A protein has these predicted regions:
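Short loop/edge segments at beta-strand edges and connector loops
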Residues: 71-73, 141, 190
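Small-residue (primarily alanine) positions within well-ordered alpha-helices
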Residues: 13, 17-20, 137, 220, ...
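N-terminal subdomain of lithium-sensitive/metallo-dependent phosphomonoesterases centered on the IMPase/IPPase/PAP
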Residues: 1-90, 271-274
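Residue-level signal for inorganic ion chemistry
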Residues: 20, 24-27, 60, 93, ...
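Generic detector of well-ordered alpha-helical packing
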Residues: 50, 89-92, 96, 123, ...
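An extended, acidic
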Residues: 147-274
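A structural micro-motif at secondary-structure boundaries
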Residues: 139-145
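DPxDG-like acidic metal-binding loop motif
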Residues: 79-138
Length: 274
């Protein structure tokens, strides 16, 4: 994409993410109302997320009616050779339900299976993380980069654990133990996209995830690469299709990867291009 094309796409992405974030904030009262209405709060949150995704699709469609749009709440098969927007209008649904701030809007533009731009918007804190391929990463318009000076013993790591009933859970818990012993503190992630944005901004030093999907990963991949962080798949598939990935400051890679250990290739990879 040319610089002019990227600039236009970035403006559209910003408008779409802000529209979704504003809807999430305005709709929080509907969760509280479930105490009276007896409606399922998770179902209400799902409806709110679908509405936010529809807003994003509408904003994008006005400028790019020819582009594919693939969202968590409305997945479609993305096609090689076509531009596709990957969206998660509510990444961190559990925290949204509880009124916590650890949720975000995630949006990325992928062209020929390569993420070109990514934005992660934290509406609770009004923090907008954005990155354009080859042009760096920003937080609310100011350049950001990953942390490079943290001693390994003081590293702040984050793990996106799978569901409690996942066959991967035992493996991931073992990884948490090794990383906590061999590096520094480890916290459990709720919003994967927001965690990757925080790594890009130097707030944490490493992140890894099992059962990841490209809705969350695409925006984070651009942010991480453009901030100077390393991001890699662990399951021998292209990064955008990976279900298990890790990211960190370059100086931590060797130690971090050794502590994580190998991961088996899973037949249940994220939806592939075709």
């Amino acid at each position: 994409m040319t610089d002019a094309e990227l600039d236009l796409a970035a403006h559209v992405a910003e408008c779409a993410a802000y529209a979704a974030g504003a809807h999430l904030l305005a709709s929080r009262a509907r969760i509280a109302e479930t105490m009276v209405t007896r409606h399922d709060p998770e179902q209400v949150a799902g409806t709110i997320a679908a509405e936010a995704a529809a807003l994003m699709r509408s904003v994008i469609g006005r400028t790019y009616p020819q582009h594919d749009f693939c969202a968590v709440d409305a997945p479609t098969r993305w096609r090689t050779g076509r531009a596709c927007w990957f969206a998660d209008a509510l990444d961190g649904r559990a925290d949204y339900l509880r009124g916590s701030g650890a949720y975000a809007v995630s949006l990325a533009l992928v062209v020929d299976a390569e993420p070109q731009l990514g934005v992660v918007y934290d509406p609770q804190r009004n923090e907008f993380f954005g990155a354009l391929r080859g042009r760096g990463a920003v937080l609310n318009g100011k350049p950001i980069c990953c942390e490079t000076q943290t001693p390994p013993r003081l590293a702040r790591m984050a793990a996106a654990l799978p569901r409690s009933d996942s066959p991967r859970m035992a493996r991931c818990i073992a990884e948490v133990g090794r990383v906590a012993t061999g590096l520094g503190t480890v916290r459990r992630s709720v919003s994967r996209a927001l965690e990757m944005a925080h790594l890009a901004a130097g707030r944490i030093d490493g992140f890894w995830a099992h059962e990841l999907d490209h809705f969350n990963a695409a925006a984070g991949i651009v942010l991480l690469r453009e901030s100077g962080a390393l991001v890699e798949a662990r399951d021998a598939v292209p990064l955008l299709d990976s279900r298990s990935m890790f990211a960190c400051a370059p100086a931590l890679r060797k130690r971090f990867l050794a502590l994580l250990g190998p991961v088996a290739v899973s037949p249940g990879t994220a939806a592939a291009s075709g």
